[in-house]
Amino acid sequence: MARKSLIQRERKRQKLEQKYHLIRRSSKKEISKVSSLSDKWEIHGKLQSPPRNSAPTRLHRRCFSTGRPRANYRDFGLSGHILRERVHACLLPGATRSSW
């Protein structure tokens, strides 16, 4: 199980991303509209002003039950080994058993 501080850090990043989402999107639209290079550099500077953790690339999908950041299945929101355990225990309807 992931440490609680890491999970809280991830939640903080999600809140920051939601807060600065509109600013980033509007700045990117402005860059595509402007033709002069100097104006593009100014707008690019605005894009760099929000905090780093507000960038969507800094977010990780985490397992719903354990908080593990790797090997997650989007459809279930679970990591691979938890998914396998739950499928074998017949807790996920519609999933077929496999052994690997």
UniProtKB/Swiss-Prot annotation:
- Please tell me one Gene Ontology term that the record gives under cellular component: chloroplast
Q: Which organism is it from?
A: Liriodendron tulipifera
Does the keyword section mention Glycosyltransferase? Answer: no
User: Superkingdom of the source?
Assistant: Eukaryota
Q: Which UniProt keywords apply?
A: Chloroplast, Plastid, Ribonucleoprotein, Ribosomal protein, RNA-binding, rRNA-binding
The family annotation for this protein states: Belongs to the universal ribosomal protein uS14 family.
Functionally, this protein is described as follows: Binds 16S rRNA, required for the assembly of 30S particles.
Per the record's keyword annotation, is tRNA processing included, yes or no? no
Entry GO MF terms: rRNA binding; structural constituent of ribosome
Q: Where in the cell is it found?
A: Plastid, Chloroplast
In Swiss-Prot or TrEMBL terms, this protein is called Small ribosomal subunit protein uS14c
